[in-house]
Amino acid sequence: MTKKSKIDHYTDKEALDFHNKGKSGKIEIISSKSLTTKRDLSLAYSPGVAVPVMEISKNPDAAYEYTSKGNLVAVISNGSAILGLGDLGALASKPVMEGKAVLFKRFADIDAIDIEIDNKNSDEIIKCIQNIGNSFGGINLEDIAAPDCFIIERKLRDTLDIPIFHDDQHGTAIITSAAL
């Protein structure tokens, strides 16, 4: 049983049921294009998809025009510093990362996908994110223990050409500044 503040009015069962009701979890992927005809399907995948593929191969910035990249954020954690719960592992952080993804969608209409990296080695986490970074318009680092979180953020800022937001650092700074 988790400790709750006086403003939390739910039971552990209600919290679990919320995450399990209907489809499990809090996020899903849906098409932004109509896929009702055979023509739609051939444009969405093969052979029609070859045209934007060729455009992006000639000009990588075209990915912002022909794919979801510009409105897609990766919410990434290794679960080493989950909220006030501590190091419970990558998989245990998934409900938090899904929760952050739905906040992006609900309040900014930004599509976000959770990625949990089952690794505590900062160099390996950096390499993993560098390898997938081009798929996203931004990276949101979440619930990664210090000092690794600072090392990871700094290295990614230096090597990726997309925004890197370290939620636990930047989010706290923004809220603190707003309060002042």
Residue ranges and their predicted role:
Residues 165-180:
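A glycine-rich, Thr/Ser-enriched phosphate-binding loop motif common to dinucleotide/cofactor-binding enzymes
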Residues 2-162:
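N-terminal ligand-binding/catalytic initiation module
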